[in-house]
């Protein structure tokens, strides 16, 4: 079980929160999280790079000049890979980079990553409830009250982020806002600071606590 402080919007302590999730064994935890990150990054690749082979590149099949008597190296086609504008040898073609991972392993990797970072978590009660209009300065001031550097990568996890909060954080380059249902291993491990809404913490317990 791991514990963290619950703070209000002013940065004052408003209670305690705890989380107890099943995690991977120490001997396999790093490998499991590593495979989960590789899978996530592989799935984000488009795989649309494509080049033309000598059979596909535009141009005639006529021999550019005679075989002998020119003093030059022999050439059989203007589409040969040896000439500028010719085909590409072993160039990339559209492909899928997706990696497979069992659902049970994916969930275990996510729980392991979350528990590993839980000591760095700051739970916030009623996050952004006082924001009536989108205001980036309010978010910046809030992070400053938590002693979070402007250069730190911050992950904010809420159960259902409102449009006001989304618009308030979208201009902050180092701040990423996600819904609790979109929680993932890469974002958890990549962030320097983790902020979780108190209601999002309940959602995480509900979704990931029964395995």
Swiss-Prot record:
InterPro entries (UniProt xref): Ribosomal_uL4 (IPR002136), Ribosomal_uL4-like (IPR013005), Ribosomal_uL4_dom_sf (IPR023574)
GO function term, MF aspect, one: rRNA binding
Ribosomal protein recorded as keyword: yes
Bias type Polar residues, positions: 41-53
Cellular component, GO, one term: ribosome
GO BP terms in the entry: translation
Pfam families: Ribosomal_L4 (PF00573)
Keyword Nucleus among UniProt keywords: no
Disulfide bonds: none
UniProt-annotated stretches for the region Disordered: 41-85
Top-rank taxon, per record: Bacteria
Biased composition (Basic residues): 60-71
Keywords: Ribonucleoprotein, Ribosomal protein, RNA-binding, rRNA-binding
Subunit-structure text: Part of the 50S ribosomal subunit.
Function, as annotated: One of the primary rRNA binding proteins, this protein initially binds near the 5'-end of the 23S rRNA. It is important during the early stages of 50S assembly. It makes multiple contacts with different domains of the 23S rRNA in the assembled 50S subunit and ribosome.
Annotated HAMAP family: Ribosomal_uL4_B
Membership in a protein family: Belongs to the universal ribosomal protein uL4 family.
Name of the protein in its database record: Large ribosomal subunit protein uL4
Organism: Prochlorococcus marinus (strain SARG / CCMP1375 / SS120)
């Amino acid at each position: 079980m791991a514990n963290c402080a619950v703070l209000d919007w002013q940065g004052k302590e408003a209670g305690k929160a705890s989380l107890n999730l099943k995690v991977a064994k120490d001997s396999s935890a790093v490998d499991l999280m590593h495979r989960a990150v590789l899978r996530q990054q592989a799935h984000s690749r488009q795989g649309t790079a494509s080049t033309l082979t000598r059979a596909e590149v535009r141009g005639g099949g006529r021999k550019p000049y005679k075989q002998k008597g020119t003093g030059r190296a022999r050439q059989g086609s203007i589409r040969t890979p040896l000439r500028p504008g010719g085909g590409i040898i072993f160039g990339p073609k559209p492909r899928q980079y997706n990696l497979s991972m069992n659902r049970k392993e994916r969930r275990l990797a996510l729980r392991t990553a979350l528990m590993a970072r839980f000591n760095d978590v700051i739970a916030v009660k009623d996050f952004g409830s006082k924001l009536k209009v989108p205001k980036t300065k309010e978010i910046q001031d809030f992070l400053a009250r938590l002693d979070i550097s402007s250069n730190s990568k911050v992950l904010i996890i809420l159960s259902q982020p409102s449009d006001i909060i989304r618009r308030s954080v979208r201009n902050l380059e180092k701040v990423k806002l996600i819904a609790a249902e979109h929680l993932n291993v890469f974002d958890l491990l990549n962030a320097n600071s983790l902020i979780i809404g108190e209601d999002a913490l309940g959602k995480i317990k509900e979704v990931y606590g029964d395995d």
